[in-house]
From Swiss-Prot:
Monomer. This is Phosphoglycerate kinase. It holds the Pfam family PGK. Belongs to the phosphoglycerate kinase family. GO terms for cellular component: cytosol. Pathway: Carbohydrate degradation; glycolysis; pyruvate from D-glyceraldehyde 3-phosphate: step 2/5. The gene is pgk. Substrate binds at D21, L22, N23, R36, H59, L60, G61, R62, R114, R147. ATP binds at K198, E315, G341, G342, D343, T344.
Length: 388
């Protein structure tokens, strides 16, 4: 099923309401990382350049619903947008009754949608109020597409026209390219502390990919399932059978050497050893150089790569070499590569490979749910509206 795209519509003179994900970190009234604002900027500029009356809405943090709070106000985001665009972007607090002005080619930013009662529960009355403000609703926030809320789902049901913004459309296209008809061989990297939190992702990818690289605590569980000693490493002993059943479906190249320490700390001494030599008081905190080199070769010959999660505790430099080696291999590969998940983005930043990854997903939870094959409510609503 397809969706209507904002780029296919004539926006001139239209009231265009765009839902973006501008949930950025703010400290002392200043935006400290503007990656999400930068990602949304092309959509906002495009609508303004086409002569639309542009309204942008987003959530910020987790305020108590229905209560205005200074710390969750969109004011710092408005100030940051103003500096990026070179003109004032007013932040409108009481907008639900439409008591504000926007010129053609102009822009206003609405105050935090979570200050509105009924936002989280996808309240119909609130959804209709949002919808009444616009001629065209643009859903451009992939990061919140997995939540059925009034500003992502309900408004799309009642707006005269509901479409996908360029950011959301690009995200769906990239994920579709990686998961629906991947060029082979396809290699997926799934790493994290627990198998239990990534179980659906592992199961889903085991059906699609040719090789599944596991890392972090997840790898320890797979190592233990293959009868290797993992010492006092993070490991889920109750999921060994689950790990074995996944390993029976897809090739999972396990590390042959690892980097261990006696404690989990920034100053812990790193020790490289073959997997067979892990002792009872060891913690496995990264894959070893031999394993990293072998996996890098695997990645270089791949045609599609999906990356979710660092393979070691890369925040501590002595346990970051595995993740660094794989990040560089993905960057050097000719494969179509897609990466997503908070820790993954931090690793991409740390090792400076963002320019070399084909697509970096902006959604954490939404990215994982899409990979799991789940329906994203906001996207499903756009598909439904397109089919009318």
């Amino acid at each position: 099923m397809s969706v209507i795209k904002m780029t296919d519509l004539d926006l001139r003179g239209k009231r265009v309401l765009i839902r973006e994900d501008l949930n950025v970190p703010v400290k002392n009234g200043k935006v400290t990382s503007d990656a999400r604002i930068q990602a949304a900027l092309p959509t906002i500029k495009l609508a303004m350049e086409q002569g639309a009356k542009v309204m942008v809405m987003s959530h910020l943090g987790r305020p108590e619903e229905g209560q205005f709070s200074e710390e969750n106000s969109m004011q710092p985001v408005g100030a940051h947008l103003s500096s990026l665009l070179g003109h004032d972007v007013p932040v409108v607090r009481d907008y639900l009754d439409g008591d504000f002005e926007v010129e053609e080619g102009g822009l206003v930013l609405f105050e935090n949608v979570r200050f509105n009662v009924g936002e989280g529960k996808d309240n119909e009355e609130l959804s209709k109020k949002y919808a009444a403000l616009c001629d065209i609703f643009v859903m451009d926030a992939f990061g919140t597409a997995h939540r059925a809320q009034a500003s992502t789902h309900g408004v799309a049901k009642f707006a005269p026209v509901a479409c996908a913004g360029p950011l959301l459309a690009a995200e769906l296209e990239a994920l579709g390219q990686a998961l629906d008809k991947p060029q082979r061989p396809m290699v997926a990297i799934v790493a994290g502390s627990k198998v239990s939190t990534k179980l659906d992702v592992l199961n889903s990818l085991s059906e699609v990919c040719d090789q599944l690289i596991v890392g972090g605590g997840i790898a320890n569980t797979f190592l233990a399932a293959a009868d290797h000693k993992v010492g006092k490493s993070l490991c889920e002993m109750d999921l060994l059978d689950t790990a074995r059943s996944i390993a029976a479906k897809v090739q999972i190249p396990l590390p042959t050497d690892v980097v261990t320490a006696k404690a989990f700390s920034e100053s812990a001494e790193a020790s490289v050893k073959p997997i067979a030599e892990v002792t009872d008081d060891d913690m496995i905190l990264d894959i070893g150089p031999q394993s990293a080199a072998a996996l890098a070769e695997l990645l270089k010959s791949a045609k599609t790569i999906l990356w979710n999660g660092p393979v070691g505790v890369f925040e501590f430099d002595q346990f970051g070499d595995g993740t660094k080696t794989l990040a560089q291999a993905i960057a050097e590969s000719d494969a179509f590569s897609i990466a997503g998940g908070g820790d993954t983005l931090a690793a991409i930043d740390k090792y400076g490979v963002s320019e070399k990854i084909s697509y970096i997903s902006t959604g954490g939870g939404a990215f994982l749910e899409f990979v799991e094959g789940k329906t994203l409510p906001a996207v499903a609503m756009l598909q439904k509206r397109a089919a009318e």
